A protein has these predicted regions:
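Acidic, divalent-metal-binding catalytic cores of TOPRIM
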Residues: 91-316
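Switch/communication elements of ASCE P-loop NTPase nucleotide-binding domains
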Residues: 1-127, 146
């Protein structure tokens, strides 16, 4: 069926090319032609979808077709076209259609928008492009959140796939580039509910002219304000989106939180299943987990700068 569809579309395109040819049609040549293709991915494997898309783009570039309209649910197709060529139709409410125009959202006269557009375009692949088709999105910083969130949801008797919720790994704190696409305060944005999960990552810097922020433990936060300046990550974002109509920022507890991995270990401090053979201090951690007394645990710790900081914080 896929090849039959291609043959049929090729015949239609050949006729359109002939109809627009002055040499062939003389004065009857059609000067304005549009091509509309619905669900071109039907029965076509990804490589053939790319090939067909390239064929259409070549026809437009050569002037055989003035404009091409294509409807698609293919992530391969979406990831292969430019952002300015996309129009995203969503239905946040039954009977209501929202139209999103990425080419309008990212303004060419704004340097920040240009940088964001370039990043999003590089980021999109056949997997990430699924964000245009999901009903709701959860943006996360890394692979741990991407893998574990669906598992945590199942423990709560929720299935993210059934709810059409997609977890998107940003590979870092690059939320701002993508939030422009979905910020409903801006016209022509794509209307979806967005959650951004980010690590609170407490940090501190010495009160010196050339001081730089460095990561610190939650129990070290604000204990030496005379010599250090402290801050948490995402304070601005959490406040900025607290009352936003479709975007929210969430992070760990201010008192105890640091990262997802840190919190998992803190809540399951005697669970050896969390340890892998690649951990450099595997024996040390297993020995500490075997103890129930804090002082005995500290006695199993190796001498290092990080462990000294931990012991000092516990003692104080």
């Amino acid at each position: 069926l896929g090849y039959n569809n291609l043959i049929y579309m090729s015949l239609l395109l050949a006729k359109m090319q002939a109809d627009s040819s002055i040499i062939y049609m003389k004065r009857n040549a059609k000067v304005l032609s549009f091509l509309a293709v619905e669900e071109c991915e039907a029965h076509l494997h990804p490589a053939m979808q790319y090939k067909f898309l390239q064929f259409l783009q070549d026809n437009k570039a050569n002037g055989h077709v003035r404009q091409i309209f294509m409807t698609s649910h293919s992530t391969q197709i979406v990831s292969a076209v430019k952002l300015e060529d996309l129009i995203c139709l969503t239905s946040p409410v039954l009977g209501q259609i929202n139209v999103g125009y990425p080419r309008i959202i990212y303004r060419e006269d704004n340097a920040d928008d240009v940088a964001s557009k370039q990043y999003v375009q590089r980021f999109l692949d056949a997997t990430k492009a699924d964000m245009f088709f999901a009903n709701k999105l959860i943006f996360v910083e890394g692979i741990a959140e991407e893998l574990l969130l669906p598992v945590f949801a199942r423990y709560l008797n929720k299935n993210l796939t059934d709810e059409h919720v997609l977890v998107v790994n940003m590979g870092g704190r690059y939320f701002n580039h993508f939030l422009k696409l979905f910020d409903t305060k801006n016209p022509y944005s794509i209307n979806k509910k967005i959650v951004c999960l980010t690590d609170i990552d407490p940090c501190r810097k010495k009160n010196e002219p050339d001081g730089e922020y460095e990561s610190c433990y939650p129990y070290e936060y604000d204990i030496d304000t005379a010599n250090y300046d402290y801050k948490h990550h995402a304070d601005t974002e959490v406040a900025q989106y607290a009352a936003h109509p479709n975007i929210r920022f969430y992070r760990q507890d201010v008192t105890y939180g640091k990262t997802l991995e840190y919190d998992i270990m803190r809540e399951n401090s005697d669970c050896e299943l969390l340890l892998t053979n690649s951990v450099s201090n595997l024996k040390e951690l297993k020995a500490m987990m075997a103890e129930q007394d804090v002082n005995k645990m500290m006695g199993k710790m190796r001498n290092s700068e990080a462990n000294t900081r931990i012991k000092t914080s516990i003692d104080t």
